[in-house]
Amino acid sequence: MGKRYFCDYCDRSFQDNLHNRKKHLNGLQHLKAKKLWYDMFRDAAAILLDEQNKRPCRKFLLTGQCDFGSNCRFSHMSERDLQELSVQVEEERRAREWPLDVAELPEVCLEDWLEKRAKRLSSAPSSRAEPVRATVFQYPVGWPPVQELPPSLRAPPPGGWPLQPSVQWG
């Protein structure tokens, strides 16, 4: 048996030769599947532009369904759908322009913010009457004893890991 060609758009395979591949790639099922795939990645502005240029589909308006589906030459969107889509396009446009508005804000220095924070914390009365206790590390329930755990799952020593002098990595 010869090599087989698998089409990702159609999710099917066939014998790979020039005639079969050309016939498949120009076939209606393949073209529909390919269009459907690329339509998933279209932005709202392109969809809105296409839908505004189409006339409403009479069959879809009367029966609620159309035999042509997404390949119909006419629009299946109602006026309300078009308005919602235009609002979405406007929000996306504003979101793209937002970084331009951020550039106009005054530049704040980290040191200034830290100084203000330190002043605020020192002038505010302490709301805690008791000292802060260190949290005690506990292993999850159902884990094996600590001696059986690999080093990566064991708790760090109380003072932290000791630094190894002149250790080279890699």
Curated annotation (Swiss-Prot):
SUPFAM superfamilies: beta-beta-alpha zinc fingers (SSF57667), CCCH zinc finger (SSF90229). Keywords: Metal-binding, mRNA processing, mRNA splicing, Nucleus, Spliceosome, Zinc, Zinc-finger. Transmembrane segments: none annotated. PROSITE patterns: ZF_C3H1. The keyword Cell wall biogenesis/degradation does not apply. A zinc finger (C3H1-type) spans 51-79. InterPro entries: U1-CZ_Znf_C2H2, Znf_C2H2_sf, Znf_CCCH, Znf_CCCH_sf. GO terms for molecular function: zinc ion binding. Pfam families: zf-CCCH, zf-U1. Residues 150-170 are annotated as: Disordered. It comes from the Eukaryota. GO terms for cellular component: U12-type spliceosomal complex. GO terms for biological process: mRNA processing; RNA splicing. It is found in: Nucleus. Gene3D superfamilies: Classic Zinc Finger, Zinc finger, CCCH-type. The keyword Chaperone does not apply. Component of the U11/U12 snRNPs that are part of the U12-type spliceosome. This is Zinc finger matrin-type protein 5. It comes from Bos taurus.
